[in-house]
């Protein structure tokens, strides 16, 4: 399970990095050891990280707070929030970052 989780989570973090690395020049993005930090021009910081013990990806957002995402392979093949099954990791990141740039 952990090997499969790490492969899926790493792929997702790579996708997030690729999406936002060239997204807007107002963003500063760092990707180090399974952690992504995205800082907006007005100093809002988003942190996305792999949490291996729980098999989750965690998001710390200055807008909506903390989210824990689990992989939903049954329906959407995406990472959904444990707080609200309608929240997907890429969707919430795009929405919140767009509101800051």
Task: State where each predicted segment sits.
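N-terminal intrinsically disordered, cationic/polar leader segments
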Residues: 1-101
